[in-house]
Curated annotation (Swiss-Prot):
Its main location: cytoplasm. The keyword Electron transport does not apply. Fourteen ClpP subunits assemble into 2 heptameric rings which stack back to back to give a disk-like structure with a central cavity, resembling the structure of eukaryotic proteasomes. GO terms for biological process: protein quality control for misfolded or incompletely synthesized proteins. The gene is clpP. It catalyses: Hydrolysis of proteins to small peptides in the presence of ATP and magnesium. alpha-casein is the usual test substrate. In the absence of ATP, only oligopeptides shorter than five residues are hydrolyzed (such as succinyl-Leu-Tyr-|-NHMec, and Leu-Tyr-Leu-|-Tyr-Trp, in which cleavage of the -Tyr-|-Leu- and -Tyr-|-Trp bonds also occurs). It comes from Photorhabdus laumondii subsp. laumondii (strain DSM 15139 / CIP 105565 / TT01). InterPro entries: ClpP, ClpP/crotonase-like_dom_sf, ClpP/TepA, ClpP_His_AS, ClpP_Ser_AS. SUPFAM superfamilies: ClpP/crotonase. Gene3D superfamilies: 2-enoyl-CoA Hydratase, Chain A, domain 1. One of its GO terms (cellular component) is endopeptidase Clp complex. This is ATP-dependent Clp protease proteolytic subunit. HAMAP family: ClpP (MF_00444). Cleaves peptides in various proteins in a process that requires ATP hydrolysis. Has a chymotrypsin-like activity. Plays a major role in the degradation of misfolded proteins.
Amino acid sequence: MSYSDKRDQYAPHMALVPMVVEQTTRGERSYDIYSRLLKERIIFLTGQVEDHMANLVAAQMLFLEAENPEKDIFLYINSPGGVITAGMSIYDTMQFIKPDVSTICMGQACSMGAFLLTAGAKGKRICLPNSRVMIHQPLGGFQGQATDIEIHAQEILKVKSRMNELMAKHTGRPIEEIAKDTERDRFLSADEAVEYGLVDKIFTHRD
């Protein structure tokens, strides 16, 4: 997780988005694949977590809540992490809305991606069998005058403490253990993520 927003690093581009054509009473209607999946209450969180992506994910969750506040939302995560403030806007929206948000890790959920994976509704946090999860402490890289660096160092320590508190809440592990385990990058397989309490189960096939 990065404390600062280095926007030039976070510019994922999709060269080709498949289109889906559906037959309706009024003729054919085409959707891009992600819009079609949104109709099934599926949201994709892929690539770096940054402000633009976070706004889109939050907006989709709010839209689905308005459509049906009782029906689950499915958030598929394949992310190396990103900016903390952007990730926290997604986290707060997940906790705020009425529908349960089921989180599914495909590929990887690292750093802020892992945090959002763990923030899903209890009993509905899932890893696919060959996915991996990585947790660590927030990263900082502020430059400037000594006094400003000190201010930002104090702030990132506050953020670190808050993130540890929330991870402890969602995993059920002691905050001291979370703090120790996130001092360095810690990679976990799907099985290890279940054992640690980051997710609840592994899905190999649909029921």
